[in-house]
Amino acid sequence: VAVIPGFQGLTSDDRITTLGRGGSDTSAVAVAAAVKADRCDIYTDVDGVYTTDPRIVPRARKLAKVTYEEMLELASVGAKVLQTRSVGLAMKENVRVQVLSSFDDPTENPITGTLIVGDDEIGEDEMERQLITGIAHDKNEAKVTLTRVPDRPGAVANIFGPLAEANINVDMIIQNIAHDTGSTDVTFTVPGAELARTIDTLEKGKDAIGYQELMHDTKVSKISVVGVGMRSHAGVASTMFKALAQRGINIQAISTSEIKVSVLIDEDETELAVRVLHTAYGLDAEDAA
């Protein structure tokens, strides 16, 4: 048995460095790819990937299999099981990853976790039946609004260009144009940890952007539903919006990808929204504890 240290690597100029958050998982996947292992088992503090956080929804179900793409989306929008880099590497190198619990005793119970695989191992029939795979939430969001930005070519580039140069990741974007004033309000979200740098960058560029006021709100949360099944099914977003509206939960922003729909809501309504959507998409386990 080879024991190999993880969480470290070399920079482009051959200096030893650490890999940052999720570095151990990334190391494990990289080694598995290098030795062409059949599977990479990652032991962590949870026993698999669930349809959502079981602490919020006790009826959440553990998933037997998840596609790379779904796991990548779930990890990027708040699921804490694996970091995006390890999942992305597994997807690139086609390494099957199994998430297992460090606390399970294999001599007493059969080892059961979640297997992260390619679409070909899931099967079209299974993907058709399973519209939504999981629901994730992320409270580490900040909403920024710039009011009365001149409605002219290049105005948006003056906002997001400097943010990109500062390596600040922008997620949801909304632009509301007031035709009678020739100006627009631009709202977007950034990671909460990047809010201070975002404000500093925008204040330095105020003259170039031409906005009137900068407002921000950290009491927001992003809720995301993820599933490869939505590629072939209509009405996923409609179900989400209707379920939230019926419980009086207001949507502040929306973003979508091929297999994901995300909404921004008040932070205080996070747990309620997750529970409502988990039920709306039929994800509740039948044998609830």
Residue ranges and their predicted role:
Residues 1-289:
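C-terminal catalytic "cap/lid" subdomain
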